[in-house]
Amino acid sequence: MHESHLVVILALLLLALWCLSTRPVQPSCHVEINGHSIIVTGNCWHSTQRPH
């Protein structure tokens, strides 16, 4: 069953769209897929941390 791969791909697409929507000025969120390893670079994670 390759459903797990489809779920991962959909999750990456949603993450990419969300990162682009949260930072429309500087879309520096980059996602690479090498085999089964997922590499996420950029300041995408910094934009998700909001001070309470």
Swiss-Prot record:
Sequence ranges on the Cytoplasmic membrane side: 22-52
Main localization of the protein described in the UniProt heading: host cell
Keywords: Host endoplasmic reticulum, Host membrane, Membrane, Transmembrane, Transmembrane helix, Transport, Viral movement protein
Keyword Ligase: no
Family: Belongs to the Tymovirales TGBp3 protein family.
Note: TGBp1, TGBp2 and TGBp3 seem to act together for cell-to-cell propagation. TGBp1 is the main movement protein that physically cross the plasmodesma with the viral genome. TGBp2 and TGBp3 would facilitate TGBp1 function.
Topology, Lumenal side: 1-3
Protein name: Movement protein TGBp3
Pfam families: TGBp3
One GO CC annotation: host cell endoplasmic reticulum membrane
Highest taxon above the source species: Viruses
Transmembrane segments: 4-21
